[in-house]
Amino acid sequence: AHPHSSDQVSVVHNGIIENSTILKKFLEKKGYVFKSQTDTEVIAHLVSEYLKKNSLKNTIIKVLKKLHGSFALGIIFKGQTDLMVGAKRGSPLAVGYGPNENYLGSDSYALKSMTNKISYLEDGEFCIVKKDQIEFFDTDGSNINKKVMNLSKDELNYDKGDYKYFMEKEIDEQPTTINDCINEYIDKYNNQINIYNFPWKISTIKSVMLIGCGTAFHSCLIAKYWMEQNTNLDISVDIASEFRYRKVRFKKDCLYIFVSQSGETADTYAALDLCKNNNMKTCAVVNVIESSIARDADLVLPIYCGQEVGVASTKAFIGQMLVLYILSTKISFDQKILTKDEYKAKLKNLLYLSSLAKKTLNIDQKILKIGKVFAEAKGSMFLGRGYSFPIALEGALKLKELAYVHAEGYPAGEMKHGPLALIEDGMRVVVIAPRDQH
Protein backbone atom coordinates (compact mmCIF):
# COMPACT_ATOMS: atom_id res chain seq x y z
CA ALA A 1 0.00 0.00 0.00
CA HIS A 2 1.09 3.56 -0.64
CA PRO A 3 3.16 5.42 0.35
CA HIS A 4 6.38 3.57 -0.49
CA SER A 5 9.53 4.79 1.22
CA SER A 6 13.29 4.82 0.77
CA ASP A 7 15.49 6.32 3.47
CA GLN A 8 14.11 9.87 3.90
CA VAL A 9 11.71 9.76 0.92
CA SER A 10 8.06 8.64 0.68
CA VAL A 11 6.10 8.47 -2.59
CA VAL A 12 2.48 8.04 -3.64
CA HIS A 13 1.94 7.28 -7.30
CA ASN A 14 -0.91 6.84 -9.75
CA GLY A 15 0.07 5.28 -13.08
CA ILE A 16 2.45 2.68 -14.51
CA ILE A 17 6.25 2.88 -14.78
CA GLU A 18 6.94 0.85 -17.92
CA ASN A 19 10.70 0.53 -17.39
CA SER A 20 10.52 -0.33 -13.67
CA THR A 21 12.31 -3.69 -14.16
CA ILE A 22 15.35 -2.01 -15.77
CA LEU A 23 15.44 0.69 -13.08
CA LYS A 24 15.11 -1.90 -10.33
CA LYS A 25 18.21 -3.76 -11.57
CA PHE A 26 20.10 -0.45 -11.71
CA LEU A 27 19.13 0.36 -8.12
CA GLU A 28 19.86 -3.14 -6.79
CA LYS A 29 23.42 -2.77 -8.09
CA LYS A 30 23.59 0.42 -6.01
CA GLY A 31 22.68 -1.62 -2.92
CA TYR A 32 18.96 -0.83 -2.61
CA VAL A 33 16.80 -3.63 -1.18
CA PHE A 34 13.21 -3.84 -2.43
CA LYS A 35 10.42 -4.76 -0.01
CA SER A 36 7.63 -5.03 -2.60
CA GLN A 37 6.92 -5.82 -6.25
CA THR A 38 5.35 -2.43 -7.00
CA ASP A 39 6.83 0.02 -9.47
CA THR A 40 6.24 2.87 -7.00
CA GLU A 41 9.08 1.68 -4.76
CA VAL A 42 11.43 2.14 -7.72
CA ILE A 43 10.57 5.86 -7.76
CA ALA A 44 11.26 6.27 -4.03
CA HIS A 45 14.70 4.63 -4.30
CA LEU A 46 15.52 6.61 -7.44
CA VAL A 47 14.76 9.92 -5.69
CA SER A 48 16.91 8.85 -2.72
CA GLU A 49 19.79 7.95 -5.02
CA TYR A 50 19.85 11.24 -6.93
CA LEU A 51 19.37 13.34 -3.78
CA LYS A 52 22.82 12.21 -2.61
CA LYS A 53 24.58 14.46 -5.12
CA ASN A 54 21.93 16.86 -6.42
CA SER A 55 19.62 19.63 -5.29
CA LEU A 56 15.96 18.77 -4.92
CA LYS A 57 15.06 20.50 -8.18
CA ASN A 58 17.81 18.76 -10.18
CA THR A 59 16.93 15.45 -8.55
CA ILE A 60 13.35 15.66 -9.79
CA ILE A 61 14.51 16.65 -13.30
CA LYS A 62 16.82 13.61 -13.45
CA VAL A 63 14.23 11.22 -12.01
CA LEU A 64 11.52 12.30 -14.45
CA LYS A 65 13.88 11.79 -17.39
CA LYS A 66 14.57 8.23 -16.17
CA LEU A 67 10.90 7.25 -15.83
CA HIS A 68 9.03 5.82 -18.83
CA GLY A 69 5.26 5.50 -18.67
CA SER A 70 2.46 7.45 -17.03
CA PHE A 71 2.43 8.85 -13.53
CA ALA A 72 1.15 11.41 -11.08
CA LEU A 73 3.56 11.67 -8.16
CA GLY A 74 3.34 13.06 -4.67
CA ILE A 75 6.65 13.04 -2.77
CA ILE A 76 7.35 14.02 0.85
CA PHE A 77 10.55 13.99 2.89
CA LYS A 78 11.23 12.88 6.47
CA GLY A 79 11.66 15.79 8.87
CA GLN A 80 10.50 18.37 6.30
CA THR A 81 6.86 19.00 7.16
CA ASP A 82 6.66 22.08 4.92
CA LEU A 83 7.67 20.42 1.65
CA MET A 84 5.98 18.33 -1.05
CA VAL A 85 6.83 17.63 -4.67
CA GLY A 86 4.29 16.85 -7.37
CA ALA A 87 5.00 15.64 -10.92
CA LYS A 88 2.80 14.60 -13.82
CA ARG A 89 2.93 12.66 -17.08
CA GLY A 90 -0.18 10.95 -18.44
CA SER A 91 -2.08 10.73 -15.14
CA PRO A 92 -3.89 13.83 -13.77
CA LEU A 93 -2.48 15.98 -10.97
CA ALA A 94 -3.88 19.18 -9.47
CA VAL A 95 -2.55 21.68 -6.95
CA GLY A 96 -4.92 23.31 -4.48
CA TYR A 97 -4.39 26.73 -2.90
CA GLY A 98 -5.38 27.50 0.69
CA PRO A 99 -4.69 30.07 3.41
CA ASN A 100 -1.21 29.24 4.72
CA GLU A 101 -1.54 25.71 3.28
CA ASN A 102 -1.45 24.09 -0.15
CA TYR A 103 -2.44 20.68 -1.46
CA LEU A 104 -1.82 18.00 -4.08
CA GLY A 105 -4.61 15.81 -5.45
CA SER A 106 -5.61 13.89 -8.55
CA ASP A 107 -8.31 16.39 -9.59
CA SER A 108 -10.81 18.98 -8.39
CA TYR A 109 -13.01 16.31 -6.76
CA ALA A 110 -10.16 15.24 -4.49
CA LEU A 111 -9.48 18.81 -3.38
CA LYS A 112 -12.94 20.38 -3.30
CA SER A 113 -13.49 19.86 0.45
CA MET A 114 -10.35 21.90 1.21
CA THR A 115 -10.19 24.63 -1.43
CA ASN A 116 -12.03 26.22 -4.33
CA LYS A 117 -8.86 27.30 -6.16
CA ILE A 118 -6.77 24.84 -8.16
CA SER A 119 -4.23 24.56 -10.97
CA TYR A 120 -3.64 21.53 -13.19
CA LEU A 121 -0.16 20.36 -14.12
CA GLU A 122 0.51 19.46 -17.76
CA ASP A 123 2.62 16.54 -18.95
CA GLY A 124 6.28 16.83 -17.98
CA GLU A 125 5.69 19.54 -15.39
CA PHE A 126 6.51 19.35 -11.70
CA CYS A 127 6.03 21.56 -8.66
CA ILE A 128 7.68 22.19 -5.31
CA VAL A 129 4.97 22.90 -2.75
CA LYS A 130 5.32 24.67 0.58
CA LYS A 131 2.53 25.98 2.82
CA ASP A 132 2.97 29.56 1.62
CA GLN A 133 4.59 29.06 -1.79
CA ILE A 134 4.26 26.89 -4.91
CA GLU A 135 6.89 26.84 -7.66
CA PHE A 136 6.06 25.27 -11.03
CA PHE A 137 8.65 23.98 -13.50
CA ASP A 138 8.71 22.52 -16.99
CA THR A 139 10.63 19.38 -18.04
CA ASP A 140 13.95 21.26 -18.18
CA GLY A 141 13.47 22.99 -14.82
CA SER A 142 12.51 26.44 -16.08
CA ASN A 143 10.00 28.33 -13.95
CA ILE A 144 6.48 28.56 -15.39
CA ASN A 145 3.24 30.27 -14.35
CA LYS A 146 -0.01 28.32 -13.98
CA LYS A 147 -3.58 29.45 -14.45
CA VAL A 148 -5.67 29.33 -11.26
CA MET A 149 -9.21 27.96 -11.67
CA ASN A 150 -12.16 28.64 -9.37
CA LEU A 151 -14.38 25.64 -8.65
CA SER A 152 -18.14 26.09 -8.93
CA LYS A 153 -20.43 25.81 -5.91
CA ASP A 154 -21.94 22.61 -7.35
CA GLU A 155 -18.52 20.97 -7.36
CA LEU A 156 -17.87 22.07 -3.79
CA ASN A 157 -21.16 20.92 -2.24
CA TYR A 158 -21.92 17.49 -3.75
CA ASP A 159 -22.95 14.86 -1.19
CA LYS A 160 -25.29 11.85 -0.86
CA GLY A 161 -28.11 13.78 0.78
CA ASP A 162 -30.77 11.31 1.97
CA TYR A 163 -29.48 8.50 -0.24
CA LYS A 164 -27.50 5.52 1.03
CA TYR A 165 -25.26 5.37 -2.04
CA PHE A 166 -23.99 7.94 -4.52
CA MET A 167 -24.94 5.66 -7.40
CA GLU A 168 -28.55 5.49 -6.20
CA LYS A 169 -28.62 9.29 -6.05
CA GLU A 170 -27.07 9.61 -9.50
CA ILE A 171 -29.61 7.24 -11.04
CA ASP A 172 -32.44 9.38 -9.65
CA GLU A 173 -30.75 12.55 -10.91
CA GLN A 174 -31.00 11.44 -14.54
CA PRO A 175 -34.29 13.21 -15.41
CA THR A 176 -32.77 16.46 -14.10
CA THR A 177 -29.40 16.04 -15.83
CA ILE A 178 -31.16 15.19 -19.11
CA ASN A 179 -33.04 18.50 -18.86
CA ASP A 180 -29.86 20.38 -17.97
CA CYS A 181 -28.05 18.99 -21.00
CA ILE A 182 -30.95 19.70 -23.38
CA ASN A 183 -31.27 23.26 -22.06
CA GLU A 184 -27.58 23.88 -22.82
CA TYR A 185 -27.72 22.64 -26.41
CA ILE A 186 -31.27 23.21 -27.66
CA ASP A 187 -32.93 26.56 -28.18
CA LYS A 188 -36.57 25.59 -27.56
CA TYR A 189 -37.95 28.89 -28.84
CA ASN A 190 -36.13 28.88 -32.17
CA ASN A 191 -36.12 25.08 -32.55
CA GLN A 192 -32.42 24.79 -33.19
CA ILE A 193 -29.27 23.20 -31.81
CA ASN A 194 -26.64 25.55 -30.43
CA ILE A 195 -23.11 24.18 -30.54
CA TYR A 196 -20.97 27.28 -30.21
CA ASN A 197 -17.42 27.63 -31.47
CA PHE A 198 -17.69 24.68 -33.87
CA PRO A 199 -14.30 25.23 -35.54
CA TRP A 200 -14.80 23.46 -38.89
CA LYS A 201 -17.10 23.65 -41.87
CA ILE A 202 -19.23 20.50 -42.02
CA SER A 203 -18.22 20.12 -45.67
CA THR A 204 -14.60 19.53 -44.59
CA ILE A 205 -15.57 16.48 -42.52
CA LYS A 206 -16.02 13.23 -44.46
CA SER A 207 -15.71 10.71 -41.63
CA VAL A 208 -15.92 10.40 -37.86
CA MET A 209 -14.04 8.11 -35.49
CA LEU A 210 -15.47 7.73 -31.97
CA ILE A 211 -13.03 6.62 -29.27
CA GLY A 212 -13.62 5.65 -25.64
CA CYS A 213 -13.16 3.02 -22.92
CA GLY A 214 -15.71 0.94 -21.00
CA THR A 215 -19.09 2.65 -20.74
CA ALA A 216 -17.87 5.54 -22.90
CA PHE A 217 -16.99 3.02 -25.63
CA HIS A 218 -20.56 1.71 -25.49
CA SER A 219 -21.95 5.23 -25.93
CA CYS A 220 -19.68 5.53 -28.98
CA LEU A 221 -21.10 2.29 -30.42
CA ILE A 222 -24.65 3.60 -30.02
CA ALA A 223 -23.72 6.92 -31.65
CA LYS A 224 -22.32 4.98 -34.62
CA TYR A 225 -25.82 3.71 -35.44
CA TRP A 226 -27.29 7.20 -35.19
CA MET A 227 -24.59 8.86 -37.27
CA GLU A 228 -24.73 6.19 -39.96
CA GLN A 229 -28.49 6.58 -40.18
CA ASN A 230 -28.63 10.37 -40.03
CA THR A 231 -25.50 11.52 -41.92
CA ASN A 232 -23.55 10.62 -45.05
CA LEU A 233 -20.28 10.32 -43.11
CA ASP A 234 -18.16 7.19 -42.74
CA ILE A 235 -18.37 6.25 -39.04
CA SER A 236 -15.99 4.02 -37.10
CA VAL A 237 -15.51 3.24 -33.41
CA ASP A 238 -12.42 2.11 -31.53
CA ILE A 239 -11.44 1.26 -27.99
CA ALA A 240 -8.87 3.81 -26.85
CA SER A 241 -6.49 1.19 -25.44
CA GLU A 242 -6.43 -0.49 -28.88
CA PHE A 243 -6.34 2.68 -30.97
CA ARG A 244 -3.20 4.03 -29.30
CA TYR A 245 -1.19 0.89 -30.11
CA ARG A 246 -2.37 0.35 -33.69
CA LYS A 247 -0.81 1.66 -36.88
CA VAL A 248 -3.47 4.28 -37.51
CA ARG A 249 -3.91 5.75 -40.98
CA PHE A 250 -4.86 9.29 -40.05
CA LYS A 251 -7.19 11.22 -42.34
CA LYS A 252 -7.30 15.01 -42.51
CA ASP A 253 -11.03 14.97 -43.27
CA CYS A 254 -11.85 12.83 -40.21
CA LEU A 255 -13.22 14.20 -36.94
CA TYR A 256 -11.87 12.20 -33.98
CA ILE A 257 -14.29 12.28 -31.04
CA PHE A 258 -13.01 11.27 -27.59
CA VAL A 259 -15.58 10.31 -24.96
CA SER A 260 -14.69 10.20 -21.25
CA GLN A 261 -16.71 11.01 -18.13
CA SER A 262 -13.73 12.23 -16.11
CA GLY A 263 -11.76 13.57 -19.05
CA GLU A 264 -8.73 11.88 -17.51
CA THR A 265 -9.03 8.29 -18.81
CA ALA A 266 -5.38 7.45 -19.46
CA ASP A 267 -5.81 5.44 -22.68
CA THR A 268 -8.29 7.94 -24.11
CA TYR A 269 -5.97 10.82 -23.31
CA ALA A 270 -3.06 8.98 -24.95
CA ALA A 271 -5.20 8.41 -28.06
CA LEU A 272 -6.08 12.12 -28.14
CA ASP A 273 -2.41 13.03 -27.77
CA LEU A 274 -1.59 10.78 -30.73
CA CYS A 275 -4.18 12.57 -32.87
CA LYS A 276 -2.99 16.01 -31.76
CA ASN A 277 0.59 15.11 -32.67
CA ASN A 278 -0.66 14.30 -36.17
CA ASN A 279 -2.66 17.56 -36.46
CA MET A 280 -6.06 15.86 -36.60
CA LYS A 281 -9.45 17.45 -35.85
CA THR A 282 -10.36 16.53 -32.26
CA CYS A 283 -13.52 16.80 -30.17
CA ALA A 284 -13.99 15.89 -26.49
CA VAL A 285 -17.28 14.73 -24.97
CA VAL A 286 -16.61 15.00 -21.23
CA ASN A 287 -18.23 15.73 -17.90
CA VAL A 288 -15.28 17.60 -16.35
CA ILE A 289 -14.49 20.66 -18.44
CA GLU A 290 -11.22 21.38 -16.58
CA SER A 291 -9.89 17.90 -17.41
CA SER A 292 -6.82 17.05 -19.50
CA ILE A 293 -8.86 15.75 -22.45
CA ALA A 294 -11.07 18.85 -22.44
CA ARG A 295 -8.09 21.19 -22.27
CA ASP A 296 -6.30 19.56 -25.21
CA ALA A 297 -9.17 18.94 -27.66
CA ASP A 298 -10.08 21.46 -30.39
CA LEU A 299 -13.78 21.34 -29.48
CA VAL A 300 -15.32 20.48 -26.10
CA LEU A 301 -18.91 19.26 -25.76
CA PRO A 302 -19.71 19.00 -22.02
CA ILE A 303 -22.46 16.59 -20.95
CA TYR A 304 -23.57 18.82 -18.04
CA CYS A 305 -24.29 15.96 -15.63
CA GLY A 306 -22.66 17.34 -12.52
CA GLN A 307 -20.24 15.33 -10.45
CA GLU A 308 -20.49 11.55 -10.81
CA VAL A 309 -18.99 9.68 -7.85
CA GLY A 310 -20.27 6.16 -8.54
CA VAL A 311 -17.66 3.95 -10.20
CA ALA A 312 -20.32 2.46 -12.48
CA SER A 313 -21.42 5.31 -14.73
CA THR A 314 -25.15 6.13 -14.89
CA LYS A 315 -26.13 9.74 -15.56
CA ALA A 316 -22.88 10.34 -17.47
CA PHE A 317 -23.70 7.45 -19.83
CA ILE A 318 -27.07 9.05 -20.58
CA GLY A 319 -25.36 12.42 -21.02
CA GLN A 320 -22.78 11.03 -23.45
CA MET A 321 -25.47 9.42 -25.60
CA LEU A 322 -27.57 12.59 -25.53
CA VAL A 323 -24.72 14.87 -26.63
CA LEU A 324 -23.68 12.48 -29.39
CA TYR A 325 -27.29 12.26 -30.60
CA ILE A 326 -27.56 16.05 -30.66
CA LEU A 327 -24.28 16.30 -32.58
CA SER A 328 -25.49 13.67 -35.04
CA THR A 329 -28.73 15.60 -35.57
CA LYS A 330 -26.87 18.89 -36.13
CA ILE A 331 -24.54 17.34 -38.72
CA SER A 332 -27.49 15.72 -40.50
CA PHE A 333 -29.36 19.02 -40.72
CA ASP A 334 -26.26 20.95 -41.81
CA GLN A 335 -25.72 18.36 -44.55
CA LYS A 336 -29.35 18.94 -45.65
CA ILE A 337 -30.18 15.27 -45.09
CA LEU A 338 -32.88 16.17 -42.57
CA THR A 339 -35.62 18.51 -43.72
CA LYS A 340 -36.50 21.43 -41.45
CA ASP A 341 -39.67 19.64 -40.31
CA GLU A 342 -37.78 16.42 -39.55
CA TYR A 343 -35.15 18.41 -37.68
CA LYS A 344 -37.76 20.17 -35.54
CA ALA A 345 -39.54 16.86 -34.87
CA LYS A 346 -36.33 15.29 -33.55
CA LEU A 347 -35.70 18.23 -31.25
CA LYS A 348 -39.29 18.16 -30.03
CA ASN A 349 -39.02 14.44 -29.22
CA LEU A 350 -35.95 15.12 -27.09
CA LEU A 351 -38.02 17.38 -24.85
CA TYR A 352 -40.02 14.33 -23.72
CA LEU A 353 -36.91 12.42 -22.70
CA SER A 354 -36.72 13.69 -19.13
CA SER A 355 -40.33 12.75 -18.30
CA LEU A 356 -39.84 9.33 -19.90
CA ALA A 357 -36.75 8.76 -17.76
CA LYS A 358 -38.74 9.69 -14.66
CA LYS A 359 -41.48 7.26 -15.70
CA THR A 360 -38.91 4.48 -16.11
CA LEU A 361 -37.47 5.11 -12.65
CA ASN A 362 -40.95 4.69 -11.15
CA ILE A 363 -40.81 0.92 -11.82
CA ASP A 364 -38.05 0.49 -9.23
CA GLN A 365 -40.09 -2.00 -7.17
CA LYS A 366 -40.40 -4.30 -10.18
CA ILE A 367 -36.68 -3.98 -10.75
CA LEU A 368 -35.97 -4.97 -7.14
CA LYS A 369 -37.97 -8.18 -7.58
CA ILE A 370 -36.14 -9.04 -10.79
CA GLY A 371 -32.84 -8.28 -9.08
CA LYS A 372 -33.45 -11.07 -6.56
CA VAL A 373 -33.83 -13.54 -9.43
CA PHE A 374 -30.52 -12.43 -10.92
CA ALA A 375 -28.78 -12.66 -7.54
CA GLU A 376 -29.20 -16.44 -7.68
CA ALA A 377 -28.01 -16.80 -11.29
CA LYS A 378 -24.97 -18.77 -12.43
CA GLY A 379 -24.49 -16.19 -15.13
CA SER A 380 -26.40 -13.71 -17.25
CA MET A 381 -26.68 -12.94 -20.95
CA PHE A 382 -27.86 -9.64 -22.44
CA LEU A 383 -29.10 -9.60 -26.04
CA GLY A 384 -29.90 -6.72 -28.39
CA ARG A 385 -29.96 -5.79 -32.07
CA GLY A 386 -28.85 -2.55 -33.71
CA TYR A 387 -28.36 0.22 -31.17
CA SER A 388 -29.79 -2.16 -28.54
CA PHE A 389 -26.64 -4.30 -28.86
CA PRO A 390 -24.38 -1.70 -27.17
CA ILE A 391 -27.06 -1.36 -24.47
CA ALA A 392 -26.75 -5.13 -23.98
CA LEU A 393 -22.99 -4.74 -23.61
CA GLU A 394 -23.52 -1.96 -21.07
CA GLY A 395 -26.02 -4.06 -19.10
CA ALA A 396 -23.54 -6.91 -18.88
CA LEU A 397 -20.78 -4.52 -17.83
CA LYS A 398 -22.94 -3.05 -15.07
CA LEU A 399 -23.71 -6.50 -13.65
CA LYS A 400 -20.01 -7.39 -13.65
CA GLU A 401 -18.96 -4.07 -12.09
CA LEU A 402 -21.58 -3.98 -9.36
CA ALA A 403 -22.53 -7.56 -8.51
CA TYR A 404 -19.24 -9.28 -9.40
CA VAL A 405 -21.05 -11.99 -11.37
CA HIS A 406 -20.37 -13.29 -14.85
CA ALA A 407 -22.37 -11.58 -17.60
CA GLU A 408 -22.02 -11.30 -21.37
CA GLY A 409 -23.57 -9.05 -24.00
CA TYR A 410 -24.24 -10.40 -27.50
CA PRO A 411 -25.92 -9.28 -30.72
CA ALA A 412 -29.31 -11.01 -30.69
CA GLY A 413 -28.70 -12.55 -34.12
CA GLU A 414 -25.53 -14.25 -32.86
CA MET A 415 -27.37 -16.26 -30.21
CA LYS A 416 -27.45 -19.28 -32.51
CA HIS A 417 -23.73 -19.08 -33.30
CA GLY A 418 -22.32 -20.35 -30.02
CA PRO A 419 -23.87 -18.54 -27.02
CA LEU A 420 -26.94 -20.82 -27.17
CA ALA A 421 -24.71 -23.58 -25.74
CA LEU A 422 -24.55 -21.65 -22.46
CA ILE A 423 -28.31 -21.65 -21.89
CA GLU A 424 -29.12 -23.95 -18.97
CA ASP A 425 -30.80 -23.86 -15.57
CA GLY A 426 -29.46 -20.92 -13.60
CA MET A 427 -28.59 -18.80 -16.65
CA ARG A 428 -30.57 -15.55 -16.84
CA VAL A 429 -31.25 -13.83 -20.17
CA VAL A 430 -32.21 -10.19 -20.75
CA VAL A 431 -33.57 -9.31 -24.19
CA ILE A 432 -33.61 -5.60 -25.07
CA ALA A 433 -36.51 -5.16 -27.49
CA PRO A 434 -37.85 -1.62 -27.99
CA ARG A 435 -40.87 -0.96 -30.20
CA ASP A 436 -39.02 -0.52 -33.49
CA GLN A 437 -37.03 -2.56 -35.98
CA HIS A 438 -34.50 -3.34 -33.26
Set out the residue ranges of the language-model regions:
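Conserved short alpha-helical segments that host acidic/polar catalytic motifs at enzyme active sites
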Residues: 1-160, 164-165, 176-183, 187-206, ...
